[in-house]
Structure formats: C-alpha cells, structure tokens
C-alpha cells in the first residue's frame, strides 16, 4: 500500500491538458522496437536516468518533481524521498554515479527536523527500507560500486538515527503505534485506531535494523505490535481463518471491526506475513502459518469471478455477511504474494491461484485505451455505470477511478509470474506496460500520472511524479530483463533477498 504523495483526492490534483505533456515519440518508437533482453533492460535504464536527471535538475533535494511544471513537492517531509527511494534501483542497475550522488545526499539528512506530520508507515517503507536495502546491496553483491566504505556505513547509521526519531510512536498502552506523529513535540494526531497494513508493514524493516545493529529494541517494538495482528481479538475480528479486520484499537490492541480485504489499507499486512517467513523461516514460522491460513481462506471465500468474464479471478472484500465486488490497482500485488508463497512453500495450488489473479489484473491493463490499468474497478452487475456497459460486457469489469499515478503492483505481479514460471508471456506483459507508460506518461523531465486510462491520450495529466516510480515501477521492469543475480526473486527456497513493500530488497537472515 502507498498513499499518494498528494493528500488531495485524485479528482482535485493539479491537472494539465494532454497537449502540455505529449510523450517523446522518437523514444517511444525506439522502445517499441526493442526485442532482446539486453536492449529492453537498457531502455529501462534510459528511462530511469531520464527521470533522475529531471529530478536533479528541477527538484533535488525536495521529495518529488512535478514533471510538467518542473515544480517541486515535499509530501514526505522534505528529506529527499525520490533520492532515497531511487538508491536500490540505481544499485541494481549498476549506476555508480547516481549511487554515489544519493549516498552523498543521505549523509546530509537530518531526520530529526521537519515542519510536517510524519507517517510512520510511509517513512519506514521508503526511507528506512531504502537505506537498509542500499546497505545490504552495497555490503554484498554490489560492493564494487562504492570505493569509500564509510559512505556505506552511513546508510546504517542514518537508518538507526531515523528509527530512534520514530520509535516514540510505539509508546502507547498496547504497543500498537500511532501512524501520524509529530517528531518535534512527540505528539500524534489523536487517532484511536491504526490500520491493519499501516501497523503490519513495519516488522521487516525494523527487524532487519535490529539484526544489522545488534540492538534488539527495534525488532521488539514492531513485533509486539504485530503480535496483536497474529492473535486477533475478539473472535469477530477474524470472520475467516487468517483473514482479519481493518482497524486496531491503539489503547488495547483489540480489533475494532471485522472488515476483510486485500485492498489498500489491509494489503501489505498479508504481503509481509509470507515475506517475514522468507526472511527467516525459523524465527517467523508463525507468520508463514498465518499467511497460509489467509491464503486458503481467500481462495475459499474471497475469490470472485465476474458475471460477464467467468474466466477472470479477483479478490472480493467482505464485511458482516456482505461481499464487495470491487478492487484496486493496489490490490494487484496479490498475485505476486500467492506466487511467492506458493514457490517457497511448494504449494502448486497457491501458484495456480496467483497466476489466475495475475491474469485478472492483466485484463485491467489489456482492456483500456492506453493499455494501463485504472486506480480502482468493480464487477458488481448492480453497479455498472450507464456509460460503461460496453466495457463491462467485454471486459467483465467497469472503472471506478480511471487515474494512474505511476503505481507498480500489476507489473510487480507480472515480474513474480515470470521469475517463478519462466513463461515468456509474463515478460511481454511487463514490456507492454512499460512501453505504454513511456508513451502516455513521459514528459520532458520525467513521468506524470494520467487522469483517465480509458480516454484518448490518457485524459489529462497529474503534475506529480511519485517516488515509487524510481523504487518500484522501473525496478521491476528492469529486473524482468536483467541477468540473473542473487537479488532476483528465486524459485523455491533459494531467495537471498526479500523485497519490502516499496520494492527495496533486504538480505534474508537465514
């Protein structure tokens, strides 16, 4: 799960007309002709450098570039989110110049200073995850990229500095943290509950920090919060075995509801259950067991096939006896999660179900005019908009929000499908998505979001470039065509790295 870096509703974001953001057609034509894995990997590198150069020219050291106006954004506290989020991708691409630029920047960050509210979740997955990943990669398989190892050590030092700034968030009666905090006053937003994903997507990064530093406090804080999610109460919080509610009371750790989904707000809790098992199957066997229960219950209770396209599979939501037939781009990580769990646990049923989910999410790309999927969609026959009946009859779904803000989840699951099956079709799906993003989102200085993926030219443009373009979209596309390496996802139990929800790979403990 990633919140948009802009807090306004998508309909109210800064828009420009398509004419102001036409793609660079010469590049588009060159990309479309790339056939070999090497040429495709190089095309992704070019896109990364294009976006990086625009960010450095117009927005550094701010958090985001506004890639149409060439303005800046500071949605992530002004610490240079795009730079930190780009580090692990630059390392994997072997770009020594950019890696060292980012290391020099990270050494200058003062994480104790910001004028804005801090999100514990977003700061953990982007900044802490990005620095820990850079450390693991540069101390290991990419150590040749940095001559001065003191720069690499700074990544771990700054990770600990950041965690020390954030850790007061866990100082609550239950240990369930506040998410929205003021690091200057040690205050919070007064929330009485925290979300499932926001609470349950800290444990990988904070545990890795403890394992690297030898200071167990960070792991203990995140794992204490996670324990409430692994052992939910009351019973109504777990309507199906392994599937739990969406909100947890900060005062006592009890769940406040039994609303179940894999959508944004819940998603990465389930993602991290199996990833913690991959990180260390001995220490986190319970996490793996809980993921299996959630996966089995999802297949049994949440799998949903659109009336007009029974060949497609999506995951519905559930609340108090009612099913919600709607989903999101965010949810499309689910295929990759089932594929990872299936290969690690040697469960062919999970692999097959994961591929079914991947096929469904691919169709949300395949059926739009741009070949890019929407922010949200539904398949409830009672709720089909009158102007989308043709789409619903043909595709089996209708679009609830046609925005695309450079999200990675569909490409992410295509990547997992490629790595775990070896079937070329999934690489082609990745490539097609990348070509279309280049065609419709590329600007003179970076990449912009789209207002309507099912309109000519993608509708208007959002004048914002999320940091996860660097961290996730371009990384997963590049990895799909890059040579094998120990940071690549592996079949079976051979993974040397595991990816956090921002696509930052950290070395497994086992």
Curated annotation (Swiss-Prot):
The keyword Cell division does not apply. Pathway: Protein modification; protein glycosylation. Glycans are attached at residues 35, 95, 182, 249, 366. Keywords: Carbohydrate metabolism, Cytoplasmic vesicle, Disulfide bond, Glycoprotein, Glycosidase, Hydrolase, Metal-binding, Signal. The keyword Signal applies. It comes from the Eukaryota. One of its GO terms (biological process) is ERAD pathway. Its main location: cytoplasm. Disulfide bonds join 332-361. It is found in: Cytoplasmic vesicle lumen. GO terms for cellular component: cytoplasmic vesicle lumen; endoplasmic reticulum; membrane. The active site is at residue 375. Ca(2+). Can also use Mg(2+), but with lower efficiency. Its EC number is 3.2.1.113. It catalyses: N(4)-(alpha-D-Man-(1->2)-alpha-D-Man-(1->2)-alpha-D-Man-(1->3)-[alpha-D-Man-(1->2)-alpha-D-Man-(1->3)-[alpha-D-Man-(1->2)-alpha-D-Man-(1->6)]-alpha-D-Man-(1->6)]-beta-D-Man-(1->4)-beta-D-GlcNAc-(1->4)-beta-D-GlcNAc)-L-asparaginyl-[protein] (N-glucan mannose isomer 9A1,2,3B1,2,3) + 4 H2O = N(4)-(alpha-D-Man-(1->3)-[alpha-D-Man-(1->3)-[alpha-D-Man-(1->6)]-alpha-D-Man-(1->6)]-beta-D-Man-(1->4)-beta-D-GlcNAc-(1->4)-beta-D-GlcNAc)-L-asparaginyl-[protein] (N-glucan mannose isomer 5A1,2) + 4 beta-D-mannose; N(4)-(alpha-D-Man-(1->2)-alpha-D-Man-(1->2)-alpha-D-Man-(1->3)-[alpha-D-Man-(1->3)-[alpha-D-Man-(1->2)-alpha-D-Man-(1->6)]-alpha-D-Man-(1->6)]-beta-D-Man-(1->4)-beta-D-GlcNAc-(1->4)-beta-D-GlcNAc)-L-asparaginyl-[protein] (N-glucan mannose isomer 8A1,2,3B1,3) + 3 H2O = N(4)-(alpha-D-Man-(1->3)-[alpha-D-Man-(1->3)-[alpha-D-Man-(1->6)]-alpha-D-Man-(1->6)]-beta-D-Man-(1->4)-beta-D-GlcNAc-(1->4)-beta-D-GlcNAc)-L-asparaginyl-[protein] (N-glucan mannose isomer 5A1,2) + 3 beta-D-mannose. Its cofactor is Ca(2+); Mg(2+). Belongs to the glycosyl hydrolase 47 family. Monomer. Involved in the maturation of Asn-linked oligosaccharides. Progressively trims alpha-1,2-linked mannose residues from Man(9)GlcNAc(2) to produce Man(5)GlcNAc(2). This is Mannosyl-oligosaccharide alpha-1,2-mannosidase 1B.
């Amino acid at each position: 799960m990633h919140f948009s870096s802009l807090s306004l509703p998508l309909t109210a974001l800064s828009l420009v007309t398509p004419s102001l953001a036409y793609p660079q057609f010469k590049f588009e034509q060159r990309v479309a002709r790339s056939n070999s894995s090497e040429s495709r990997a190089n095309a992704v590198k070019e896109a990364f450098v294009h976006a990086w150069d625009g960010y450095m020219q117009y927005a550094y050291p701010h958090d985001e570039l506004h890639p149409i106006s060439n303005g800046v954004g500071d949605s992530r506290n002004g610490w240079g989110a795009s730079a930190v989020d780009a580090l692990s991708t630059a390392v994997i691409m072997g770009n020594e110049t950019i890696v060292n630029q980012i290391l020099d920047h990270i050494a200058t960050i003062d994480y104790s200073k910001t004028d804005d509210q801090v999100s514990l979740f977003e700061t953990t997955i982007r900044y802490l995850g990005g620095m820990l990943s850079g450390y693991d990669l540069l101390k290991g398989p990419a150590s040749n990229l940095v001559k001065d190892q003191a720069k690499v050590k700074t990544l771990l030092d700054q990770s600990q500095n950041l965690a020390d700034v954030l850790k007061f968030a866990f100082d609550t009666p239950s240990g369930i943290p506040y998410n929205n905090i003021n690091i200057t006053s040690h205050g919070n937003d007064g929330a009485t509950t925290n979300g499932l994903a926001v609470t349950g997507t800290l444990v990988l990064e904070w545990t890795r920090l403890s394992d690297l530093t030898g200071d167990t406090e960070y792991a203990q804080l995140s794992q204490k919060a996670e324990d409430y999610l692994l052992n939910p109460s009351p019973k109504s919080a777990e309507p199906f075995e392994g599937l739990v509610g969406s909100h947890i009371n900060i005062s006592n750790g009890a769940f406040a509801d039994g609303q179940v989904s894999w959508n944004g707000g819940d998603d990465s809790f389930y993602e991290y259950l199996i990833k913690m098992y991959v990180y260390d199957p001995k220490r986190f066997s319970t996490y793996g067991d809980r993921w299996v229960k959630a996966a089995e219950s999802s297949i049994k209770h949440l799998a949903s096939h659109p009336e007009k396209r029974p060949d497609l599979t999506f995951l519905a939501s559930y609340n108090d006896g009612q099913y919600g037939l709607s989903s999101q781009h965010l949810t499309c990580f689910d295929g990759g999660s089932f594929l990872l769990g299936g290969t690690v646990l040697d469960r062919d049923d999970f692999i097959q179900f994961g591929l079914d989910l991947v096929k469904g999410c691919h169709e949300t790309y395949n059926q739009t005019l741009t070949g890019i999927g929407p922010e949200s969609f539904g398949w409830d026959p009672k709720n089909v908009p009158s102007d989308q009946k043709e789409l619903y009859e043909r595709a089996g779904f209708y679009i609830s929000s046609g925005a695309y803000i450079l999200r990675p989840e569909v490409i992410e699951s295509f990547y997992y499908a490629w790595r775990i099956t070896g079937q070329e079709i999934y690489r082609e799906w990745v490539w097609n998505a990348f070509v279309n993003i280049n065609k419709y989102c590329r600007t003179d200085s970076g990449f912009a979001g789209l207002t309507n993926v099912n309109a000519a030219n993608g509708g208007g443009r959002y004048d914002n470039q999320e940091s996860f373009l660097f961290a996730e979209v371009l990384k997963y596309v590049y990895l799909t065509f890059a040579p094998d390496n120990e940071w690549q996802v592996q079949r079976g139990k051979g993974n040397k790295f595991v990816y956090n929800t921002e696509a930052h790979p950290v070395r497994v403990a086992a």
